[in-house]
């Protein structure tokens, strides 16, 4: 908990800071990157040139490659155990139980992502009850980091895309356009996010498409415009995906998360997370 408070302060500073910022934070256990894969400390955004940006993206690729290897090497029974523990934590969490509208990813086995199937089926299995949650899932619009979050009511609404990830068709079986989060007039309470690597300061490394960062920034702008409360952004992580604090290279476009769900439980990061978790 003490650690979480330190991270809250640091994370708040990072969220507000227009500069690249690799704070010095007390080291926590978990997975260490070798010195060769540690990020270079970056300077201010204004003085950033493309060469420096290239260097950060290069570091990101190195971290991705390291984590992909550790995920591939994970023992299958440990993976199953961790999938169960993480999903149980989510399903029993008050912030999950109370949420009315959420965006969640459809996990993909071949990408070694934390399984979300139990969470999704729990959401979709009570279509008529009062506790029904509105579920939105990603739909990749193009290769320029554009993604939408579309409403689904059944797993049958999904088909595999070219990346072999299940997603809804933007038009349903009746030929109607699906409701889209950015067009919808109700706020989202919760985002359940995928990613390749995370740290306990709120940094998240995606798969390199920029889809989530672009989407989350747009959603935050819309929430601000509408006066909506910001949603809770929670990522799910296997133990090898949790890196030493500060080892994830970031640019100002990277959106920080509020909390991590790990096999050992929830790691609240921001004050918003600490209040609701
Ligand atoms: N389940 C899930 N759905 C998602 C995402 C995700 O990360 N997970 N996305 C999140 O953005 C978006 C899709 N973006 C994706 C970006 C890259 C890859 C992918 O297969 N990457 C390979 C490497 C490919 C390469 O380097 O050329 C990999 O990570 O192994 C998949 C989805 C929307 N839907
Ligand atoms: N050298 C570079 N200079 C500028 N932009 C780049 C560079 N390399 C990649 N990009 C762009 O940055 C974006 C990817 O950013 P980043 O690596 O932070 O994504 P991510 O965090 O993995 O993705 P997501 O948000 O989907 O989880 C893409 O739009 C990509 O085109």
UniProtKB/Swiss-Prot annotation:
Annotated localization: Mitochondrion
Protein name: 5-formyltetrahydrofolate cyclo-ligase, mitochondrial
Domain of life: Eukaryota
Role: Contributes to tetrahydrofolate metabolism and photorespiration through the regulation of serine hydroxymethyltransferase. Prefers the pentalutamyl to the monoglutamyl form of 5-formyltetrahydrofolate.
Residues that coordinate or bind ATP: 60-64, 206-213, 254
Null mutant phenotype: Reduced growth rate and delayed flowering.
Family label: Belongs to the 5-formyltetrahydrofolate cyclo-ligase family.
Annotated SUPFAM superfamilies: NagB/RpiA/CoA transferase-like
Aminoacyl-tRNA synthetase keyword on record: no
GO biological process per UniProt: defense response; tetrahydrofolate metabolic process
GO molecular function, one term: ATP binding
């Amino acid at each position: 908990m003490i650690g979480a408070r330190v991270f809250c302060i640091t994370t708040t500073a990072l969220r507000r800071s227009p500069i690249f910022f690799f704070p010095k934070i007390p080291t926590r256990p978990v997975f260490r990157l070798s010195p060769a894969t540690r990020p270079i400390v970056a300077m201010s955004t204004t003085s950033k040139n493309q060469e420096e940006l290239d260097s950060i993206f290069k570091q990101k690729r190195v971290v991705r490659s390291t984590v992909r290897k550790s995920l591939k090497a994970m023992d299958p029974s440990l993976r199953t155990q961790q999938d169960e523990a993480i999903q149980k934590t989510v399903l029993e969490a008050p912030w999950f139980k109370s949420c009315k509208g959420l965006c969640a990813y459809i996990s993909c086995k071949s990408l070694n992502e934390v399984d979300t199937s139990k969470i999704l089926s729990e959401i979709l299995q009570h279509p008529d009850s009062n506790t029904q949650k509105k579920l939105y899932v990603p739909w990749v619009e193009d290769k320029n980091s554009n993604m939408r979050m579309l409403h689904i009511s059944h797993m049958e609404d999904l088909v595999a895309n070219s990346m072999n990830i299940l997603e809804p068709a933007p038009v349903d079986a009746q030929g109607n356009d699906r409701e889209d989060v950015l067009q919808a007039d109700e706020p989202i309470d919760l985002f359940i996010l995928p990613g390749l690597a995370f740290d306990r300061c709120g940094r998240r490394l995606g798969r390199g498409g920029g889809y989530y960062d672009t989407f989350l920034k747009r959603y935050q702008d819309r929430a601000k415009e509408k006066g909506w409360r910001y949603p809770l952004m929670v990522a799910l992580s296997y133990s090898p995906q949790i890196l030493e604090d500060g080892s994830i290279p970031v640019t100002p476009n990277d959106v920080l998360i509020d909390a991590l769900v790990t096999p050992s439980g929830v790691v609240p990061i921001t004050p918003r997370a600490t209040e609701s978790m």
